Amino acid sequence: MPASTYPPSVDALARRLAQQREFDRLPRTMLVDAVRSAVATAPSEAESTAVDLARLATRRLLTSVINGTGTLLHTNLGRSPRPLPTAVADRVRATTIELDLATGERGSRHGAVAELLVDLTGAEATVVVNNCAAGLVLVLAALAHGRGVVISRGELVEIGGGFRIPDIIEQSGCRLIEVGTTNRTRLADYQRAIESNDVAVVLKVHPSNYRITGFTEEVGIATLATLGLPVIGDLGTGLLDASTPWLADASGQQPNVAWIRQEPSVREWLSEGADVVIVSGDKLLGGPQSGLVLGRTAIVATCAGHPLMRPLRAGTLVMEALQETLVAYGRNDARSLPFWEQATRSIAELRGRATELVDAIAKDQVRAAECSSTPGGGTMPNTQIASYGVRISGSYVDALRGWSVPIIARGHDGATWIDLRTVDPADDEVVLAAIRAINFGL
């Protein structure tokens, strides 16, 4: 058989690919898989096919991108942007996740985080799990296993990924008791359900990813608290306090974030009588993915002692990142957090950055333009935040996404938009280089 008819050596080809810088992040096993697939499907073009497959494999790895969509809490991009915890970035040492340095004895992983959350929200106690849905499962299992959970039909929400509140209630070992109708639920509906069923708790779910308007009626936390049963509030969105005292500057001046003032907060629901409130850490809090369970000491203690607490608890990296987030709040310096920095950027600043980029490109197809950002992350539907960005005539979303540092842009109205509200100013040069190279070859 002529030598040219033999398939190339998988090992040799994998070694050649490993020498290419663009594949530095790929482990050898993935390079070998790419080469084997290429040899099996296109032996005569094995090397070029293997390169293509290796590039696809590289793209499947988690990597940092530039969010130019204008969605502050983009679920597909990890929701609230955040740097690595200082403790992780600065050293490779052990951490006092469950050690009390004062006594040398075993401590609680919630220590300082719990103290900070109590100060910031008015809660009596708190525990942290790995996300909001986990928090709801834990609370329901601890307080209502085998018994009824009463909830308005207008609050039987579905969150991302097809997960539904009724299914979560069922998996918690509880019995769902629906009351009212989709658009109108009254106190009497809850009362009748409690009188005729074995009800353990009342569940109030904030419909954060949709709105029901028009001929509507709902029962607030304060009224539900008169029913004589524990009230669980699934707030989800994670706003600690609608007055945002931690955003004020040294003179007490608040930034223009009027769009958030009508959003219910943890402090509000607790003060109105909720026994426990559950929120996400990576939404309007601006921290890592986590679920915060805040409320009365006895209830939180019951949750902390439940067998599900162990498998659902947050890990060390999450607790460190959450602690740093809350310390910024405690210092009234929440604007230093990436999410709040983006949310509070002024139109003047954004317009100036857009103008500088457009002037540097100097092409008729590219101009600075007004646009609208959105909170995202299943929060505040229909809320628009005035913004500014770069508008490129034509469709270049795919090209920008394929840049060395992927830029996630938005296609709309025959143009490609890069909303600068969600782009770090330090990345403006990357955006400039990408637009020049991909579109105009400058």
PLM region spans:
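Long amphipathic alpha-helical segments
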Residues: 1-61, 65
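Short Gly/Ser/Thr- and Asp/Glu-enriched loop/turn motifs at secondary-structure junctions
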Residues: 8, 66-70, 285-288, 385, ...
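Glycine-rich phosphate-binding segment of PLP-dependent enzymes
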Residues: 35-36, 40, 68-69, 79-103
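Long amphipathic N-terminal alpha/beta scaffold segment
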Residues: 44-82, 87-89, 115
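A short linear hydrophobic-aromatic micro-motif
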Residues: 61-62, 279, 405-410
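Conserved PLP-enzyme active-site core in the AAT-like
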Residues: 104-316, 320-327, 434
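Conserved PLP-dependent catalytic core of the aminotransferase class-I/II
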Residues: 151, 318-319, 323-376
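Conserved C-terminal alpha-helix-loop-beta "cap" of PLP-dependent enzymes
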Residues: 351-430
